[in-house]
A protein has these predicted regions:
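N-terminal secretory signal peptides that target proteins for export/translocation
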Residues: 1-12
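N-terminal signal peptide c-region/cleavage motif recognized by signal peptidases
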Residues: 29-31
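Surface-exposed, charged secondary-structure patches
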Residues: 35, 71-126
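Short, aromatic-enriched amphipathic alpha-helices that serve as compact interaction elements
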Residues: 38-56
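Surface-exposed patches in mature extracellular/periplasmic domains of secreted proteins
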Residues: 55-65
Length: 162
């Protein structure tokens, strides 16, 4: 025990300070990033994880709160997603209500700074295909736009903005 005390005294570091420093380092390294995802597929998978049976807040569609906006969207979409809308349906599932089948996710192409990902699923028996345009930002992958066969998320949010 004396050898350890002597060694600590010579380095000038007290055990409590060393412990707190290591604890702080572990907390910093294990905290999730404020935005983005590690892969394009994980981003799209996490979008549709919010579309369950509506028995909880986690299954009532992708939220419009600040934390979700920063995590999922490119800064150019933040204001549009946050703004109240009179939208007649949820663009990401193409319906006002949903009962989704398994979601199939595949990368269509990688082009310069963007990756195009297709998500296909059935919503109440109706086939739906959504094309996500994703960009790799400083904190990970985020949504730049989403396209349905008839519209884009950017145009949709602009059209139904209050």
């Amino acid at each position: 025990m004396k050898a350890n005390s002597r060694k600590m005294a010579t380095t000038g570091v007290k055990p409590a300070v060393l412990f707190l420093g290591l604890l702080g380092l572990v907390c910093l390294c294990s905290s999730p990033s404020a935005a983005g995802f590690r892969s394009p597929e994980s981003l799209v998978r996490n979008v549709y994880a919010y579309y369950g049976d509506r028995t909880s807040a986690l299954s009532s569609g992708l939220p419009h709160d600040a934390e979700t906006i920063r995590q999922f969207f490119d800064p150019s979409l933040w204001d549009a997603w946050r703004a109240p809308t009179k939208a007649p349906y949820d663009f990401l599932v193409q319906s006002a209500s949903w009962k989704l089948s398994a979601v199939s996710i595949s990368i269509l192409r990688k082009q310069f700074d963007r990756t195009y990902v297709t998500a296909t699923f059935d919503n109440k028996g109706k086939p739906v295909t959504m094309n996500f345009i994703l960009v790799n930002g400083p904190d990970g992958w985020v949504i730049y736009d989403v396209e349905s066969p008839h519209d884009s998320l950017r145009a949709y949010l602009t059209q139904y903005r209050n």
